[in-house]
């Protein structure tokens, strides 16, 4: 009993010490925040105008792809704003990000509630899949009904992840919360109306091609990138899923969240979200200070690392179930083979 208590105290102390080490980086520079937000949204606006007005479709396509990448970067800023990491007291930022939420299909009430739950429960074996992709253990899978297995496989299927514009942002983040609780998630209706009105207006004024290149295509690409980044950073080969009694915020950050190693260009477009283990440790660190925190805190410098290589992407999608006996993620095929061998 005494040794168990001492171990828990040690874990608690480690949590406090590591969190304390990150505190200096949780202080934003308002000037820097406005620079990165302002420049990103101006570039996004310019790219969207290019996608709408360029004289030839190949140029419009390039502008549309650029818009998608800038949408990803803008989303990270919206995400940081919702965590109160940047510009939390700014009224202009409040309006800017509310308008952006309609383009990105991310109503503030639904997003903030589910995402905060995710931060408080990521990596827990028995946590509900709120704000995250569902995760079953092999024991849960063994006991699950056929219908539950089908729903689980559909939710974690690559097409569901890559079709995130419809499956994640339209359905899970926006429409379903409103249908479940209209009075609480009234802003989801505003987001749906705003998003639909934007598409309809562009279609009426400029034709389907304008709506396609300005909203439909870039949102499809940006949502696929964003959904995969979120999936991969909590579903990878060397991750750990922890029982509630041994779960701590530090272990969730370092063992259940990955570091996505990217080149400088993709780090810029993804707003340093690859430093996900640090973000989960301290959500108040602005995205532009995450590399600084990693460089300064030795305990953050040996994370589980993944990349965007095809090998790593395939490996992430093969991480389907948590095997408590093996203490690792396994594929459906591995589970079936192991079950047949018993």
Model-found features: residue ranges?
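Non-catalytic, topology-defining segments of multipass membrane proteins
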Residues: 1-70, 77, 94, 101-216, ...
């Amino acid at each position: 009993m005494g040794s168990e208590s001492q171990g828990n105290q040690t874990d608690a102390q480690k949590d406090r010490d590591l969190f304390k080490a990150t505190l200096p980086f949780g202080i934003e520079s308002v000037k820097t925040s406005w620079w990165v937000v302002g420049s990103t949204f101006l570039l996004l606006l310019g790219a969207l105008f290019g996608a709408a007005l360029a004289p030839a479709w190949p140029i419009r396509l390039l502008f549309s792809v650029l818009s998608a990448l800038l949408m990803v970067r803008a989303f990270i800023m919206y995400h940081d704003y919702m965590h109160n990491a940047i510009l939390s007291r700014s009224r202009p930022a409040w309006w800017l990000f509310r308008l952006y939420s309609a383009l990105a299909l991310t109503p503030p009430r639904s997003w903030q509630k589910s995402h905060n739950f995710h931060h408080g429960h990521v990596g827990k074996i028995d946590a509900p899949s709120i704000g995250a992709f569902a995760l079953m253990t092999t024991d849960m899978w063994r006991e699950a009904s056929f219908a539950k297995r089908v729903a689980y496989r559909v939710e974690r299927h690559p097409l569901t992840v890559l079709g995130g514009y419809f499956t994640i942002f339209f359905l899970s983040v926006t429409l379903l919360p409103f249908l479940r609780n209209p009075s609480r998630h009234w802003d989801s209706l505003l987001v749906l109306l705003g998003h639909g009105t934007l598409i309809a207006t562009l279609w009426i004024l400029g034709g389907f091609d304008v709506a396609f290149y300005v909203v439909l295509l870039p949102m499809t690409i940006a949502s696929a990138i964003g959904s995969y980044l979120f999936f991969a950073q909590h579903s990878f080969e060397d991750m750990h899923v922890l029982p509630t009694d041994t779960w701590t915020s530090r272990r969730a950050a370092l063992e259940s969240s990955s570091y996505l190693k990217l080149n400088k260009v993709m780090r810029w477009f993804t707003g340093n979200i690859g430093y996900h283990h640090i973000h989960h440790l301290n959500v108040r660190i602005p995205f532009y200070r995450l590399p600084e925190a990693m460089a300064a805190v030795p305990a953050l410098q040996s994370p589980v690392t993944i990349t965007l290589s095809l090998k790593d992407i395939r490996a992430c999608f093969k991480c389907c179930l948590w095997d408590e006996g093996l203490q690792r993620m396994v594929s459906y095929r591995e589970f079936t083979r192991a079950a047949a061998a018993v």
